[in-house]
């Protein structure tokens, strides 16, 4: 088989986006330097990022185009939007060049702010408006829109002064461009008093005052300039850009957390073996499997998992359930969709997307439809479906964590106890996750299938790209809630796994010590130790010596087996063994509960900080997911959840959600993946890399 592995491409691309977002200080706008979704997101969310309009690269072509339009307009040339009416009214003619442009802006300032209605959101976020201003500016640099250089410089100054107009949330069909939202940017430039501008995060003033504060005067629009300002896909593409930045980061986050889920659920890492994916070579599947194989390589939790199953091979099914085992196959189309959507949106970012396109070199205006945002609209629908797929995967994994039958020894609801009759752990999150998942699946329904003819049947097909981008942004917010809940639960599971290991050692030590003190035969001691290791600790933690719970039942059964075994041997008295076993059980009741309670209470108070002198409590220290655990527990100051703790699940999940929403989560993500891109074909400790095994399986 000669398939080629497309190695680490989407991981590399996403890490590149994150680094660009974090490091960019200046965005060059010249029509030749590509602008990525990370650049757009950085400008939207970081006030320290500036825009640099490079005159040397593009001013000449911009001014040549503008001069051509003015000359043709004054000569009475028949050019759409210059000497004609707009849209379905393009059969009208006029020589009132400036008045025509002013009239266009006036009629398009038709959005409505719905303050006082049920929804508290009635305007597009300032982040989207700033991004749209950047993309409109970039579109003009191609020199085929007919706008003056001075207008472009004004946009640059407004952006660098953090001034932008307030824009109503609704009203765009995204063909012919985002007319109504973009009219508010034009309204700011011409100083319309009805347009309100934001200065920074807090100040709101009328457009004329905003211009005055940054040393600008209202523009009197010349031929085509009003049309150039409004007739493009800039708002839809701007919002789609920040959406795609987030979608990429969340995709990589979900992929990575699949590995953490495998650790805490005691899954088998076999699902990521290279040969499985070599014979079904979807690029996204191969890349996801390679990432997960690397994350789980030499995992200390995998060592613990193998030890767990070696005791009793019938403890769980031979194969893990689909939420883990088929995760690379499930992720494959989601990876590809988000990758393709990113490319499509970035193509739109770096385009001239208005009409007509001025071909001044050939002395003509080309009437087309680059304002049609269907590429963005359709891909926003596709991305929303992909986001729903990510959410469904998280929901399935979360459900496995909550159910003791599926979680391989973890307590139901991830409850620490000790009294499970009054400790319901993360049950509330379990319910919330179902609600999140249901709403997310609903949002996966397409927007672009709901097109209506607009503007006197001139815009008889339109993209609805901005609406679709808004809904995708909404879907991503829900996915962030699901990731926050899932990560919180997995940190709880890590604590429970580490505590489980520590408690099993306590039980083994107590059983071994008492067996020696009571003079039990070696074979009897071995039987008892097998039970101590084999019985899941959380099935009896509530009351270790309760005769109705699995530990004591198992020990008693083992003792009975020892008595029977001795009885079958001639010449050996069983009475002495019975007496010794009775003494063993009495001492066990006195000692075991106290020692287990001491360990549990200490861990409940200090969590992983109790790890100084206990190997069992440092299992996470050797995991690649330590950065996530440490970030959640230390940086965000959360703790293991128990009935004794006053903290509610909401308080901890809120901290994690906020860190995802504001981007801080990328810090542990980058630390977690540090070294992945630079892995050689061979690996230390005799473990081969994914690529090495791939090459050998030809």
Swiss-Prot record:
Q: Which Pfam families match?
A: Lyase_aromatic (PF00221)
Cross-link 5-imidazolinone (Ala-Gly): give the residues: 175-177
The UniProt entry, under PROSITE patterns, shows: PAL_HISTIDASE
GO terms in the biological process aspect are: alkaloid biosynthetic process; cinnamic acid biosynthetic process; L-phenylalanine catabolic process; L-phenylalanine metabolic process; paclitaxel biosynthetic process; protein homotetramerization
Q: Which InterPro entries match?
A: Aromatic_Lyase (IPR001106), Fumarase/histidase_N (IPR024083), L-Aspartase-like (IPR008948), Phe/His_NH3-lyase_AS (IPR022313), Phe_NH3-lyase (IPR005922), Phe_NH3-lyase_shielding_dom_sf (IPR023144), Taxol_Phe_23mut (IPR031008)
Which pathway is it part of? Alkaloid biosynthesis; taxol biosynthesis; Phenylpropanoid metabolism; trans-cinnamate biosynthesis; trans-cinnamate from L-phenylalanine: step 1/1
Kindly list the GO CC terms recorded for this protein: cytoplasm
Q: Which Gene3D superfamilies match?
A: Fumarase/aspartase (Central domain) (1.20.200.10), Fumarase/aspartase (N-terminal domain) (1.10.275.10), Phenylalanine ammonia-lyase 1, domain 3 (1.10.274.20)
Key word Glycoprotein present: no
GO MF, one term, reads: phenylalanine ammonia-lyase activity
The UniProt record lists the EC number as 5.4.3.10, 4.3.1.24
Keywords, alphabetical: Alkaloid metabolism, Cytoplasm, Isomerase, Lyase, Phenylalanine catabolism, Phenylpropanoid metabolism, Taxol biosynthesis
The record lists the catalysed reaction(s) as: L-phenylalanine = L-beta-phenylalanine; L-phenylalanine = (E)-cinnamate + NH4(+)
Q: Where does (E)-cinnamate bind?
A: 231, 319, 325, 355, 427, 455, 458
Which residues of this protein are catalytic?
Answer: 80
Mark the transmembrane ranges. none
Q: What is its main location?
A: cytoplasm
Q: How is it modified after translation?
A: Contains an active site 4-methylidene-imidazol-5-one (MIO), which is formed autocatalytically by cyclization and dehydration of residues Ala-Ser-Gly.
- State where the protein is found: Cytoplasm
2,3-didehydroalanine (Ser) modifications at:
176
Chain's role:
Phenylalanine aminomutase that catalyzes the rearrangement of L-phenylalanine to R-beta-phenylalanine. Catalyzes the first committed step in the biosynthesis of the side chain of the alkaloid taxol (paclitaxel), a widely-used compound with antitumor activity. Also has low phenylalanine ammonia-lyase activity.
Entry's family note: Belongs to the PAL/histidase family.
The name on file for this protein is: Phenylalanine aminomutase (L-beta-phenylalanine forming)
Q: Which organism is it from?
A: Taxus canadensis
């Amino acid at each position: 088989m000669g398939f080629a592995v497309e190695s680490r491409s989407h991981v590399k691309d996403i890490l590149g986006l994150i680094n660009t977002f974090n490091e960019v200080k200046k965005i060059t706008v010249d029509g030749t330097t590509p602008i990525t979704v990370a650049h757009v997101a950085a400008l939207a969310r970081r006030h320290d990022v500036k825009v640099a309009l490079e005159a040397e690269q593009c001013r000449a072509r911009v001014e040549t185009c503008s001069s051509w339009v003015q000359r043709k307009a004054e000569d009475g040339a028949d050019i759409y939007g210059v000497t004609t009416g707009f849209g379905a009214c393009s059969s009208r003619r006029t020589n009132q060049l400036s008045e025509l442009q002013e009239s266009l802006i006036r009629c398009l300032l038709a959005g409505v702010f719905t303050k006082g209605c049920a929804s508290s959101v009635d305007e597009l976020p300032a982040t989207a408006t700033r991004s749209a201003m950047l993309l409109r500016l970039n579109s003009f640099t191609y020199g085929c829109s007919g706008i003056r250089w001075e207008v472009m410089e004004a946009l640059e100054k407004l952006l660098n002064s953090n001034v932008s107009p307030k824009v109503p949330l609704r009203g765009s069909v995204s063909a012919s461009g985002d007319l109504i939202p973009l009219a508010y940017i034009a309204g700011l430039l011409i100083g319309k008093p009805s347009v309100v501008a934001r200065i920074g995060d807090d100040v709101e003033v009328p457009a004329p005052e905003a211009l005055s504060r940054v040393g600008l005067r209202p523009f009197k629009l010349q031929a085509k300039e009003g049309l150039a300002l409004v007739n493009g896909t800039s708002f839809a593409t701007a919002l789609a850009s920040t959406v795609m930045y987030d979608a990429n980061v969340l995709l990589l986050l979900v992929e990575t957390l699949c590995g953490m889920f495998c650790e805490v659920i005691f899954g088998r890492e076999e699902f990521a073996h290279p040969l499985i994916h070599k014979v079904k070579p979807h690029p996204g599947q191969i890349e996801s499997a390679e990432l997960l194989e690397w994350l789980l390589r030499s995992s200390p939790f995998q060592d613990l998992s193998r030890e767990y199953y070696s005791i009793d091979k019938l403890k769980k099914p031979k194969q893990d359930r689909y939420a883990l085992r088929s995760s690379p196959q499930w992720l494959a189309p989601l990876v590809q969709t988000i990758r393709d959507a990113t490319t499509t949106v970035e193509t739109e970012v770096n385009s001239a997307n208005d009409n007509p396109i001025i071909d001044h070199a050939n002395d003509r205006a080309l009437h087309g439809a680059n304002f049609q945002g269907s590429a963005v609209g359709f891909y926003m629908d596709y991305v929303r479906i992909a986001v729903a797929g990510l959410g469904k995967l998280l929901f399935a994994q979360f459900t496995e964590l909550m159910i003791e039958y599926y979680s391989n020894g973890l307590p139901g609801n991830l409850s620490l106890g000790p009294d499970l009759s009054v400790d319901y752990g993360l049950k509330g999150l379990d319910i919330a996750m179902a609600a999140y998942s249901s709403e997310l699946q609903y949002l996966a329904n397409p927007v672009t299938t709901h097109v209506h003819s607009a503007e006197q049947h001139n815009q008889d097909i339109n993209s609805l790209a901005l609406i679709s981008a808004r809904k995708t942004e909404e879907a991503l917010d829900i996915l962030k809630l699901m990731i926050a809940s899932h990560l919180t639960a997995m940190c709880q599971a890590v604590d429970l796994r580490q505590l489980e290991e520590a408690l099993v050692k306590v039980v083994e030590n107590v059983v071994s010590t008492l067996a020696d003190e009571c003079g039990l035969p070696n074979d009897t001691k071995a039987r008892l130790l097998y039970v101590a290791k084999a019985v899941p600790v959380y099935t009896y933690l509530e009351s270790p010596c309760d005769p109705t719970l699995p530990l004591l039942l198992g020990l008693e059964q083992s003792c009975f087996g020892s008595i029977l075994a001795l009885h079958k041997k001639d010449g050996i008295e069983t009475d002495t063994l019975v007496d010794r076993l009775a003494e063993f059980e009495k001492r066990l009741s006195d000692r075991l509960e106290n020692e287990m309670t001491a360990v549990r209470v200490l861990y409940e108070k200090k969590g992983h900080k109790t790890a100084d002198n206990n190997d069992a409590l440092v299992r996470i220290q050797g995991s690649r997911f330590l950065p996530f655990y440490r970030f959640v527990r230390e940086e965000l100051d959360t703790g293991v959840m128990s009935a004794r703790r006053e903290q509610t699940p909401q308080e901890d999940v809120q901290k994690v959600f906020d860190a995802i929403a504001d981007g801080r989560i990328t810090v542990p993500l980058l630390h977690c993946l540090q070294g992945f891109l630079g892995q050689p074909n061979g690996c230390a400790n005799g473990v081969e890399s994914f690529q090495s095994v791939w090459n050998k399986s030809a």
